[in-house]
């Protein structure tokens, strides 16, 4: 990715931004997530957003583009409500190489992200508390440890059953 230190200097915000060059332990990360008003991800090709999920596990709403695994986090598939602000995709590119033939990159606009931040900070204390409770419930029921274990187990059972039902013996003949 880009050199964030250089970016902060170019923007003139280097005195208000802190970068860590060391690994931050879980207890400190938990504190940071808990004191955050929201978590923003501007990823354009996210398989699954771990930082956004960690944030949600503390009840912190997220702002994220509707791309990849972030869509499942920011949009509650049960009722299509949002766990923060879901950013629409404003530009889509198709990238390819020898190792990865084709992959879409979905970009949300900076203007939409700015509006989302304004929306989050415009919520009343009661609205923030209600959203935080919703985010926390969704994160724990959909992505909590027991649910993950259950889904993993069910997937393995399905794979084994499908393999047994669809197994065909192949005879290889020499030509």
PLM region spans:
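A short, well-ordered alpha-helix in the C-terminal region of glycosyltransferases
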Residues: 112, 119, 126-142
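Aromatic "clamp/platform" in nucleotide-sugar-dependent glycosyltransferases that forms part
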Residues: 44
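Short alpha-helical donor nucleotide-sugar binding micro-motif in glycosyltransferases
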Residues: 31-36
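C-terminal alpha-helical cap of glycosyltransferases
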Residues: 145-175
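Nucleotide-activated donor-binding/catalytic signature segment of Leloir-type glycosyltransferases, i.e.
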Residues: 1-23
